[in-house]
Amino acid sequence: LKPAGYVSGALGKWHLGLTEEYHAINRGFDEFYGFMGRGAHPYFDHSDMSHPIYRGLTPIKEEGYLTTRITEEAVDFIGRHKDEPFFLYVAYNAVHAPPEAPEEDIKQVTGDETRDTLMAMIKHLDNGVGEIVNALKKHFLFDNTLLIFLTDNGGSGTMHANNAPLRGFKQMDYEGGIHVPFIVSWPAELEGGKKCEVPMWSI
């Protein structure tokens, strides 16, 4: 996209290699905030500098709930690049293990106790996506922005997910492990409310 004049950013989980050679910055992105692969990353404790949060190629000491920080970085990126074409890849760590959420979010959940933290994590992620959408609307970019929301696998049994009516969980070939949401929004070009039956694969 660079030859077409786009600025690009990658935020969150970079699951495409662990060495500097495969870092997002060395794969064409202009900006990066997040961590390198290895599956999970703690949501609150970012002190392990052997598995750090990066800004660009530089490991940084960070504080705050990771889902919140990724959202804040996304909103900031949109504000800084609102007057030029951009591509922003936002890969939330949520709702991957470990099950960690802000206490105030957990208190708002009144479901099965074993699922309260997972539900709070989903709520926090949902709010984050809403903040990104609101940032696009604030800068009058929403209608002409292609927005894609998807996940890489079904819910995890160890995280007390419930994929019903689909059978199975993450790491299974049943539909509960691989049949996931894929939502596209582009008001200027696509009519809303439609359903596409063509299979999609996100990897």
Where are these regions (language model features)?
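Formylglycine-dependent sulfatase
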Residues: L1-I203
